[in-house]
């Protein structure tokens, strides 16, 4: 009997060992539950940092000066229907030989507009090559329409008063239509070919130095008599005369004897011209003369024959003149399109 019990015990132990060896009595291990990945479209992006010290644009100041230009059949010795703007000081730009589509003209116009001048005067050659109606808006209005009133072109809005006062140049004469495209495009005082206006402390006289001027361009002409009488009658602190062909120049075209009128004797304070594609300042008989002809035409001229009295001659880059004036001072600067101040000159009342 004892032997039978031992045999049963042996087989029971053996079965238990087999079960343990096969792993059937091992405690089950719980597998972690898999978490599906979040789709990229549902991940909220990290918000960008809020900008700091953001510059707030400042509104451009609107010029307060006013000058109206009413065309008349013939110019008068003093401006008509041209109210004198106040107050002073005033700030204006001078450009010359600029009227040709291209990068130099674009650069100079950007420079001039960055000054926020009250108005612009030009020393001629506004519309290369031949003063035609077909090219006048792209050569002028494209760059300066904001200053022209009334503006009849296609490049944007014009000014609410006229702030653009050109002088006629030889390239503003059309072989077929004469000065008419120019006269149709602008609404200027007087007969439009030569005229005057007062702005702040300055009485401006724009001349037509072209030989095709009906009233002549020599010292004994109708035009010269008009200037002489106008200068004599002027009561402004300053009298500024401007034209295209220079009375004195050291550049390629040189001095034009026919325009060497007695400006100082007649009462002019300063004389501006263009024609030579240079910048030059001269003092002749104690009167300052400037040549401003680097405002857009790609050709730049060289020094040919230095005139006695020449103070500075420059032809290395394109640019324009900035003038600031009060009743007692006029301050002239010629500045290149790169912002280089080439020359400064100050006039003071005695």
Name what the model sees in each region.
Residues 83-139, 229, 249-250:
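N-terminal active-site segment of His-dependent metallophosphoesterases
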Residues 31, 86, 312-350:
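A short C-terminal boundary segment appended to hydrolase-like catalytic domains
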Residues 19-21:
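C-terminal motif of bacterial Sec signal peptides marking the signal peptidase cleavage site
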Residues 26-88, 350:
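Ser/Thr-rich, Proline-interspersed low-complexity disordered segments
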């Amino acid at each position: 009997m004892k032997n039978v019990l031992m045999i049963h015990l042996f087989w029971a132990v053996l079965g238990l060992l087999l079960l343990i060896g096969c792993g059937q009595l091992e405690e089950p291990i719980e597998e972690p539950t898999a978490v599906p990945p979040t789709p990229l479209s549902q991940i909220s992006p990290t918000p960008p940092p809020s900008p700091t010290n953001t510059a707030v644009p400042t509104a451009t100041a609107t010029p307060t000066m006013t000058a109206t230009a009413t065309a008349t059949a013939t110019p008068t010795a003093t401006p008509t229907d041209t109210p004198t703007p106040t107050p002073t000081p005033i700030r204006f730009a001078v450009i010359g030989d600029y009227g040709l589509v291209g990068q130099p003209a674009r650069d100079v116009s950007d420079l001039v507009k960055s000054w926020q001048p009250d108005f612009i005067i030009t020393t001629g050659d506004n519309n290369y090559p031949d003063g035609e109606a077909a090219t006048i808006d792209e050569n002028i209005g494209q760059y300066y329409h904001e200053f022209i009133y009334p503006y009849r072109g296609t490049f944007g809005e014009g000014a609410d008063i006229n702030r653009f006062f050109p002088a006629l140049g030889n390239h503003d004469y059309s072989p077929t239509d004469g000065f008419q495209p120019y006269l149709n495009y602008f609404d200027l005082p007087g007969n439009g070919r030569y005229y005057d206006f007062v702005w702040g402390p300055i009485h401006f006289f724009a001349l037509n130095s072209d030989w095709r001027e009906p009233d002549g361009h020599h010292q004994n002409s109708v035009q010269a008599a008009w200037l002489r009488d106008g200068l004599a009658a002027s009561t402004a602190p300053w009298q500024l005369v401007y034209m295209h062909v220079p009375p004195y120049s050291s550049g390629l075209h040189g001095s034009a004897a026919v325009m060497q009128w007695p400006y100082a004797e007649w009462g002019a304070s300063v004389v501006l011209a263009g024609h030579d594609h240079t910048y030059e300042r001269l003092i002749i008989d104690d009167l300052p003369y400037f040549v401003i002809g680097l405002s857009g035409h790609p050709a730049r001229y060289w020094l040919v024959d230095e005139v006695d009295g020449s103070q500075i001659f420059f032809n290395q880059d394109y640019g324009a003149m900035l003038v600031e004036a009060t009743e007692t001072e006029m301050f002239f600067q010629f500045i290149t399109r790169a912002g280089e101040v080439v020359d400064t000159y100050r006039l003071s009342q005695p």
